[in-house]
């Protein structure tokens, strides 16, 4: 992946092009964004692993929603009770549930059918491998997580109203932080640098469990904040966004010493 010619993975002027233009820097980061965006679309084994799990997440969310309804009450009365449940902030559970889609995508990002092409990371002048990871994560966030989150957010806003908007913004920023912390604490793997068949289910399960623990901690803190001091939520948003900025910067500054050797 050459820094001198980042247009290698440059698509036509569609959605990916516009997102990369506004949210990535030229060079390794933007090239990785294009690469991950297109491999997610084209890699057959990756899609067979990713999309069924995304569908499962959606089904489980529907199951949780409908099992919370009482059969002996009208649907509208059930909705009214649901709005009041958990101090009126029960929607945070559904909002943070969308993290399952992101955790699944991140756990699969290192694997690809053409993993032997990973030697290019070392052969070409990739000076900041951390930017490759950041570009890949941004592609997954916009390609996988954001559409799922927008669907859930539209449902939440239709039921709970605009009072949930500040919380949803905070959930989105927190979710990006959660994904970056999980990827950083897990072993660093460059995008599509390993074979599908050597993927260890236990390692992926551990990564998903780690993300769930972080989600529980951050989501629980958010719930307490929204329940007892809701006026602090809009104040917290710029503070958390600033923390995300420095986290991304720290990730981009990672050197090759932070990465495992690619065995090709």
Tell where the protein language model's regions lie, with residue ranges.
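Hydrophobic alpha-helical transmembrane segments of membrane proteins
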Residues: 1-121, 128-264
């Amino acid at each position: 992946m050459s820094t001198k010619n980042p247009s290698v993975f440059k698509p036509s002027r569609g959605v990916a092009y516009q997102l990369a233009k506004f949210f990535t820097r030229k060079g390794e980061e933007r090239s990785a964004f294009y690469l991950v965006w297109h491999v997610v679309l084209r890699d057959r084994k990756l899609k067979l692993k990713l999309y069924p799990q995304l569908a499962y997440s959606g089904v489980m969310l529907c199951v949780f929603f409908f099992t919370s309804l009482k059969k002996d009450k009208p649907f509208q009365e059930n909705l009214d009770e649901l709005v009041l449940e958990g101090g009126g902030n029960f929607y945070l559970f559904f909002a943070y549930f969308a993290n399952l889609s992101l955790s699944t995508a991140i756990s699969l990002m290192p694997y690809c059918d053409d993993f032997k092409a990973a030697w290019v990371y070392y052969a070409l002048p990739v000076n900041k491998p951390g930017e490759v990871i950041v570009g890949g994560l941004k592609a997954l966030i916009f390609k996988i997580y954001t559409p799922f989150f927008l669907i859930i957010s539209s449902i939440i806003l239709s039921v709970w109203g605009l009072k949930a908007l500040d919380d949803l913004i905070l959930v989105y920023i927190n979710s990006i932080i959660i994904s970056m912390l999980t990827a950083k604490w897990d072993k660093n793997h460059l995008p599509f640098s390993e074979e599908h068949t050597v993927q260890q289910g236990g390692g992926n399960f551990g990564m998903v469990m780690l993300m769930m623990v972080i989600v529980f901690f951050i989501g629980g803190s958010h719930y307490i904040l929204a329940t007892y001091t809701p006026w602090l939520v809009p104040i917290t948003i710029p503070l958390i966004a600033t923390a995300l900025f420095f986290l991304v910067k720290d990730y981009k500054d990672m050197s090759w010493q932070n990465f495992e050797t690619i065995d090709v």
